[in-house]
Amino acid sequence: KEKQLILEACCQHDFGKANLIFQAVINPELAEKLNLKPRKVKQIPHGFLSGLTISKDEFLRKSELFTVKDFLPYMTAIYYHHDREDRYTPAEIQEWAERYYLPQLKEYTGEEHKELYATYIGRLLFRNDPTAMRKVITPEMRNEYLLIKGMLNKFDYAVSAGYAEAELEPDLIKKELKASVERYLQEKELRPAQQYMKEHKDENLIVVAPTGSGKTEAALLWLDGEKGFYTLPLKVSSNAIYKRIKGRYEYKNVALLHSDSLSMYLQEASEESVDQRQNRAKMLAWPVTVCTIDQLFKFVYGAIGTEIFAATLKYSKLVIDEIQSYSPEIIAAIIYGISIIQKMGGRFAIITATFPPVLAHFMERYGLLEGKEYQRVDFSADTSIIRHKIEIRDSEMDPEELLEQGSKKKVLVICNTVKSAHKLYQVLESKTEKSW
């Protein structure tokens, strides 16, 4: 049913462009022939007109799968498929459409249209008018609207940009990224977090594991070749993960998306058009996208034009890394956003070194119940990972020993006084250029 709703919306959403004023604007010869001055005539947005052309009964006859509850999400998606302020009354739209739209509609569609249905405008899920009364709509109707509107925009943007496909080919069959990660890890035993996420690839997860436990690779194994978004709080972190996927794992179908991602594409100087790569990233078309969280969660504020993010996340996997780094305001948006994504059918994995218990409390308030909507597992007690070795010396430091240790790993030396630290540094500096 969802596919059918999206297809029907794609077919109907631009009917309104058949109106005489729009045609006269794009075709000056027509305007001259009809002695029209279209720039002096008030225009009604074509999306508003497209929504007038079908009644509830006609809508239900389009598919036996459609129900009365589908009609208003469908109509609202068509009506506002562009972000246009709506201060017209149904009567004003009806009068304008009867004069400039209805006569042209038959020529455009090849079908007889005797009536326009402006009365449905007052029943839309919402009006893009700050003075209009806000309605209470069910989560089911809201999510259906998000899906129809989001996918309609996604297809519309792709076609307008000259692309035949709205999505680049996913990695579902070859699973090249997963295979590359597995090759990289083949000489090592999978760490607990990696093994767990690989085995629970079809579930929503919260995985707590210490720094250095291979959470990034665990998340890539969890993606399992499906369309995925890997989110981080900082641009520099996003750049690092993007480089790791593209470099270490030699996976080319990965995109980077944040406020400064264009500079990264320019640095790469690839044969592919930089603009094209950036535009496809903005359209959420790549199989794997590394991005900052703000690039995806705009839809939680309900702004028209952001539905594409929720609709795309419905059939994607979302990785949220370093959730502890966000401010309370962003945490609130993330929790609300994943509650919507989960209800729509998308999947999420939160990977973190620290997961404050209060987050689980607020997730539960939004219907995200541990053990039902997601599984939580904590590997922070894993003592197999030794990141630092500390030794206290009562005697003078031996520069030769430090140089030997420094040839194998990083060594941090803390002295009692500035004078002794400076003296030791001078000795080391005279023997190696790698001292700081």
Label the predicted regions.
Residues 357-407:
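Interdomain hinge/linker at the junction between the two RecA-like core domains of SF2 helicases
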Residues 1-174:
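Accessory nucleic-acid engagement/destabilization modules that flank
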Residues 227-238, 405-429, 436:
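Conserved strand-helix element at the start of the C-terminal RecA-like helicase core
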Residues 178-206:
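Conserved pre-motif I regulatory segment
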Residues 252-302:
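Inter-Walker segment of RecA-like/P-loop motor cores
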Residues 225-249, 256-261, 355-360, 418:
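Conserved Walker A/P-loop ATP-binding site and its immediately adjacent core
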Residues 307-317, 322-379:
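Post-DEXD/H (motif II) to motif III coupling segment of the RecA-like Helicase ATP-binding lobe
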Residues 201-222, 326:
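Walker A/P-loop
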